Amino acid sequence: GCIATGSFCTLSKGCCTKNCGWNFHCNPPNQ
């Protein structure tokens, strides 16, 4: 899934689809 490092992230297919304000971390959907 997605591990967000900020607020206001949206999840789609296991990843971040929006920048979390200052940073975001996208993992493979199977994690």
Curated annotation (Swiss-Prot):
Specify the domain of life of the species encoding this protein. Eukaryota
User: Using the chain's own numbering, where are the disulfide bonds?
Assistant: C2-C16, C9-C20, C15-C26
| Disulfide bond keyword on record | yes
Tissue-level expression: Confined to the epidermis and to the mucus layer.
Q: Where is this protein localized, as stated in its record?
A: Secreted
The entry's cellular-component GO terms read:
extracellular region
Residues with the modification 4-hydroxyproline, per the entry, are P28, P29
Q: Which UniProt keywords apply?
A: Disulfide bond, Hydroxylation, Ion channel impairing toxin, Knottin, Neurotoxin, Secreted, Toxin, Voltage-gated sodium channel impairing toxin
Q: Which GO terms describe its molecular function?
A: sodium channel regulator activity; toxin activity
Site residues by UniProt (Hydrophobic/aromatic residue important for potent activity):
F8
Q: Per the entry's comment, what about the domains?
A: The presence of a 'disulfide through disulfide knot' structurally defines this protein as a knottin.
Q: Which family does it belong to?
A: Belongs to the nemertide family.
Question: Any idea what job this protein has?
Answer: Highly potent toxin against both insect and some mammalian sodium channels (Nav). It potently inhibits inactivation of insect sodium channels of B.germanica (BgNav1) (EC(50)=7.8 nM) and also delays the inactivation of mammalian Nav with potent activity on Nav1.3/SCN3A and Nav1.4/SCN4A (hNav1.1/SCN1A; EC(50)=102.1 nM, rNav1.2/SCN2A; EC(50)=156.1 nM, rNav1.3/SCN3A; EC(50)=9.4 nM, rNav1.4/SCN4A; EC(50)=15.4 nM, hNav1.5/SCN5A; EC(50)=132.7 nM, mNav1.6/SCN8A; EC(50)=66.9 nM, hNav1.9/SCN9A; EC(50)=73 nM).
The record makes one more remark, namely:
Negative results: does not show effect on rat Nav1.8/SCN10A.
Which protein is depicted? Nemertide alpha-5
Q: What organism does this protein naturally occur in?
A: Ramphogordius pseudolacteus (Ribbon worm)
